[in-house]
Amino acid sequence: MASSDVKLIGAWASPFVMRPRIALNLKSVPYEFLQETFGSKSELLLKSNPVHKKIPVLLHADKPVSESNIIVEYIDDTWSSSGPSILPSDPYDRAMARFWAAYIDEKWFVALRGFLKAGGEEEKKAVIAQLEEGNAFLEKAFIDCSKGKPFFNGDNIGYLDIALGCFLAWLRVTELAVSYKILDEAKTPSLSKWAENFCNDPAVKPVMPETAKLAEFAKKIFPKPQA
């Protein structure tokens, strides 16, 4: 399949755009990456996703698919015979992967993002408490899902790995910005080892943003709160 048949509208710094990029790499699907300029929305984006007007959007034979996790599922279904399965085959495991993916987006990432916006010490303490609780939940989820293997999905990166792993670059940037170890090996050893394995995977490394570059970008969109 030619890359012109598959296009992805996105931006290099977006963790949500990383999700379909990793999925496409896992499935060895060539694609054209159409980068949006931060702070503006192209006509193609507005036309392709008129409801939410957000990235990412996958264009497959000019048909748009929106929302990062939905795109990942679409990629897994469409190229089911290529590469490892992204979603678990067992219905219960599949349901659990979707449950934790929703938790990550609705709770865990909200807390992580709040760290960069937090002003006073009390606000930071509240965010730390939320993240530590979330990390403990995810540590147990990893142990339950991985069954002793390197990834949530077992031997290969899967749906839940992508859902959480896409935020690791932003997690590193946040740790530098607030001088606090969010993913602590002493508290979450299994999750910390998983993060190392995930970042070193050949499907992930080419699309993982460089920490220094992402840190500079973060300064533009998350100015330090005024004292």
From Swiss-Prot:
It catalyses: RX + glutathione = an S-substituted glutathione + a halide anion + H(+). One of its GO terms (cellular component) is cytoplasm. Its EC number is 2.5.1.18. Residues 90-222 form the GST C-terminal domain. Keywords: Cytoplasm, Detoxification, Growth regulation, Stress response, Transferase. Belongs to the GST superfamily. Tau family. It is found in: Cytoplasm, Cytosol. GO terms for molecular function: glutathione transferase activity. Residues 4-83 form the GST N-terminal domain. It is an enzyme of class 2 (transferase). It holds the Pfam family GST_C. It comes from Arabidopsis thaliana (Mouse-ear cress). This is Glutathione S-transferase U17.
